[in-house]
Structure formats: C-alpha cells, structure tokens
Amino acid sequence: MTLEYINKKRPSVSPELDPCSNSNYKDFQVSNTELDISVSFDKKIVSGQVTYKLTAKTPNTTSIVLDTSYLKIIKIRINGLPSDNYELVKRKEPFGSPLKISLPTTINKEFELNIEFSTTDKCTALQFIEKEATDGQTAPYLFSQCQAIHARSLFPCFDTPGIKSPYNMKVKSPYACLMSGRPKETNEEGVYCFHQPIPIPSYLVALASGDLASAPIGPRSTVYSERVGLSDCQWEFEKDMENFIQVAEGLIFKYEWLKFDALILPSSFPYGGMENPNITFATPTLISKDRSQVKVMAHELAHSWSGNLVTNCSWEHFWLNEGWTVYLERRIIGGIAAAEAKSLGEKEAAQYGEKRRHFSAIVGWNSLVDSVKTLDPKYTSLVWNLKEGSDPDDAFSRIPYEKGFNFLFYIEQQVGGIKEFDPFIPYYFKKFRYESLDTYQFIDVLYEFFEPRGKAAKLDAIDWKGWIFGEGLPPNIPQFDPSLADECYRLVDKWVDFAKSNSTDISGFNESRDIGNFEPDQHKLFLESLTEKFGAYSVSEQIIRKLPSIYPFYAASTNGEIKSSWNELLIRFGNYNTTDQIVQDFAMWLGTVGRMKFVRPGYKLLQAYVSKEFAISTFTKFESSYHPICKTMVKKDLSLI
C-alpha cells in the first residue's frame, strides 16, 4: 500500500529536477569541461576561464543559464566570438546569481562556451590561510570545499549533482597544487595540469595549493600533507589503504579511478573527509596516532563508487550518496576485521567481521537517535524537501548517513541477508555508473533485480512511506549483534548503579580494569551511553568531577572523537563555570579544530551548559580561523545570524 503512496509522489520524469540549482542543466549535454585558473595569494582570489563543450537537447533552446555566487564575470565567448548578450541576474539567497547567456540562432550542434571570471572575497568555496597559521609556517595555503552548492562561487557552472562532465584542469600557482584528477606532465614552471576522464559533477571539483609533500601509503595510494606532518600521516594510513581497496573491489567491482590518494589539510577543514576523485581531502583529526580514525578513509574510498560513480541527482536524495557509502564502509571494515582474525587463526573469522560491522552500526544508531532529538523534524526524513529554497547545508546531519545505512541494512535483512543482497551491489553500481539518480529509480532497480528472484513480496512488505518520507526514527528498529557493545554497557550500568547508591567510595572503579582493553570505538560508545544514561538520571556533579582522576586516559587522549564525547559528559553534568580548567581547555581545543562534527556541538555545549556569552566570546576569538561554511553554520547555531 505504501508503494502506491510513493508512486503518487513520483516526478513526471526521473531523475527529478534539482531545486538547489538556478541553471537550466536539463537542457544541455556537456561533453567536456576545461578549467584554466591562476591562484593569487596576495589578492586571495582565483581567476581564469572555464570552457564548456555543449549540445542543446532541443533545437529551440535560446539561452543557457549557469549558477554563480559572488563571482566577477569578465568576458564571454561563444565559439570563439565575444558575446555581450548576457545578464547576471539579481542574487537570491542561498543559491546565488544566475548567469543567463543568450545563444545565437545559428547554433544547432555542439558549441563551445568560454567564460573569463574571478572569485571575490565573498567566495564560500575557498579558504586562504596565512603562512603563520599553517603547521609548517613556510608558505600560505589554499583549499576548496565545493559540496554542496559552493562550486558556483569558484567558477560559473551547472552547480548540481544532476549533470556530469569529464574535466581537464590547469592551475598556475607559486606553490604545489593538487586537483581532483590525474596529474599530467607539464614543462611550465608553476603550472600544474590534471585530467579527469570519468564524468564528475561540479561539487567534486577540488583545488589545494601550499607547501605540500608526499609519501607512499600503498601501491595505488599516496598521502600528501604539509612537510612538517608527513611522517605521521604516512604511518596512520600505510597499513590499511590497499587492504581497503581490495576488500571494496571484492564487494563491488574494480576501482576505476587508478589512484586513491589523500591530502591531509590544515585544521580548519570543516569535514571529516571529502571524497574528491583521486585526491580525498581529509581533516587532520584523523591523525590520532592510534589508527583508530582510518575508517574515515574506508568511507571516502566507498564514495569512489557511491557518490562519485553513481550520484544522487539532487541534495534532496543525499542519502543515496551517504547511506550507501556508510553501508559499504561498514562492509569494508567488517571484511578487514575478518581477514585479520583469519590471519590469527580464528575459526570464526567471518562471524567476527560481522560482529565488527554490527558494533559500528550500534554506534551509528546512537548518533542517529541523537540527531533526531536535536534537528528540525523536516530534516529527519530520508528524502528531504528543499523545494522552498532551503540551503542544503542547513539540512546536513547524520540523518542521510545513518538512516540511509539502516534502510539498506533493513532491505538486506528483508531479502534474506548478505548472501541474497550482495549480488545486487555490483548490479546497482554498474546500472547507474556515470549517472545521477533519484530514490524512485533506486526503488525501481530493487524490484528489477529481486522480483525475478522471488523477492517481490519481501519488498512489498516494506513501509516505503515511513522509511522514505517519515520524520524521526525509522519505522523498523534494527536488531544488531551486541557482542562487542555489551562490555561497554556493563560498565555504564555499573556507573549508574553507583550514582543511584549515593556512595562516595570510588575504589570499585579502575582505569586499567575498566577501559584498558577497549578499542577506540568502544571508548566512544561507553562515553556516549554514559552521557545518555546520566541524562535520564540526575547524576551529581560530585561524581562527574571525580571522573578525570579515575580515567586520566580520556583527558590525555588526542583522538577527537574521544575528546569531544569526554568533554560533553563532563560539561553537561559537572556544573563547571567559565573559569574552570575543564571549560578553558575545551574552549581552546575548539580553536584548534575546524571539523564541524566537533565544532558545532562544542559551541552548542558551551551555550547550553556554561553560558551563551562565553560561547559567543570563544567563537569570536577563533572565528577568523574557521572555514566560511563552518563559520556560517556556527553563527546560525548561536543565533548570530
């Protein structure tokens, strides 16, 4: 019955139109894009030209409309001839200023559109960093972040995941450059060239420039960073990268992008990782010196298929990128765990790999529950409605990741488990390779694959309406294997019992005995679960203030996940004020990281449990060091805009 509801919601044509683009991308086919740019660190701009090879899909197309945001348009040429017949339409937030270019009536086949442009100081895709603020302090630094709708502030484009193109990229800079393509040899000093033969959308165009050095981390992988931190980066990733690729290839199909490299960016990078093709951009918080955060690289690798080869047609269907990627990431992590267990002679290695996958899913489920509690309900559905002019950055959360994963996990279980579901994985990615799709097409291909295998009734039984458009938690609560989580839960229960007993004798707790054998994710689960349980029970601040002396490991940890969870536990329930060292240290830490996963909850924590004035003054102190995207989102969180 709910499938009938879905069919009534279907657009007349799939994939449906992207409401976050001002462009008329549906009217054109792009066979190639040439991006030729120069970086000025003095002026803090990128300038140059973009050349498109375009074919109108209908003969009566009279204009082309591209997305721009805070760009300066210098000159336009059509088939080499200058054109003044264009208009930069008045800006409309948050989608920028459409660039409308009239086409000559003589154009009836493929044509070339060339646009000279320059970014401005309002560009939201770029962050320039003074050399004094870099780790090495030897050169300034520049990096881009175009997802979701920020490519339009870097160059005029069809800024939507709904259309793709191969790219040739050329950049001139006084410092080494990386872009989201395969490097090409060039004899020009200070000029760097890249080729991306696989069609990609605009949000995957990436640029970085600075004092970059590199080191091998596998036969198909290189890590780049500032020279000063290179050896730490190499150690963090060299053990796992090739293993990740091989497990992923066994699950899906051969890696098509040739190289899977990574760039560890300065601390202001606002995300954990960004899956730019051939060169994943990653936060330095991954360099935890215990390899515990390397799973983020498994996630970014999975994007090489989910997101980069097969792409959501618009940000309303973002779960198709991220839900699939989390699903593949956990299969990769489980596969690695099984292989390691087998190498140690474990008889039930495959089962252990599944336990690892389920443990990761439990941690993810907890983050989903937390997200549902704090988000605007309209952003907790699997498919968003952004048709009223909503900024996709406002909708960003763990929902598409974790609700999307749980939807796929539920479908996997519904059709009979891994053995039945696994053949669908390569089928899906081959069918939509190089294309963009919506959720309706995903449902269609599920039936296309499983109906001939006698599974149509299983799919019919799915609450499609509840899963796809329902707000809050999904309609079906997953059943995960709790084996690796039980140890964490037992310690949580012990603390809750102690808190309820009103005892002051803490001798029953000991760091080595309690948490000494925990793996990094178990630390995170323990801290988050303890925070949740203490939130339901009025724990005394005296107990909270004893925790640092019992578990000094947490205070000393360099793992961002642990540090964030630990400080939430202390500050929420410890009744600390602005002068307490716990609060001061946490506030200073917020100034050293730019990853929004930590920064945004951090300021919300200070605002709610210390003081709004202190949160704002701390943010003001560090505001200039944050990326434009992060800066805007924190301002919204603190009601500053």
From Swiss-Prot:
Binds 1 zinc ion per subunit. It catalyses: an epoxide + H2O = an ethanediol. CDD domains: M1_LTA4H. A peptide binds at Q145, C146, Q147, P270, Y271, G272, G273, M274, E275. It holds the Pfam family Leuk-A4-hydro_C. Its EC number is 3.4.11.-, 3.3.2.10. Keywords: Cytoplasm, Hydrolase, Metal-binding, Metalloprotease, Nucleus, Protease, Zinc. GO terms for cellular component: cytosol; nucleus. It is found in: Cytoplasm; Nucleus. InterPro entries: Aminopeptidase_N-like_N, Aminopeptidase_N-like_N_sf, ARM-type_fold, LTA4H, LTA4H_cat, M1_LTA-4_hydro/amino_C_sf, M1_LTA4H, Peptidase_M1. GO terms for molecular function: aminopeptidase activity; epoxide hydrolase activity; metallopeptidase activity; zinc ion binding. The active site is at E300, Y401. Zn(2+) binds at H299, H303, E322. Belongs to the peptidase M1 family. Aminopeptidase that preferentially cleaves di- and tripeptides. Also has low epoxide hydrolase activity (in vitro). Can hydrolyze the epoxide leukotriene LTA(4) but it forms preferentially 5,6-dihydroxy-7,9,11,14-eicosatetraenoic acid rather than the cytokine leukotriene B(4) as the product compared to the homologous mammalian enzyme (in vitro). This is Leucine aminopeptidase 2. It comes from Debaryomyces hansenii (strain ATCC 36239 / CBS 767 / BCRC 21394 / JCM 1990 / NBRC 0083 / IGC 2968).
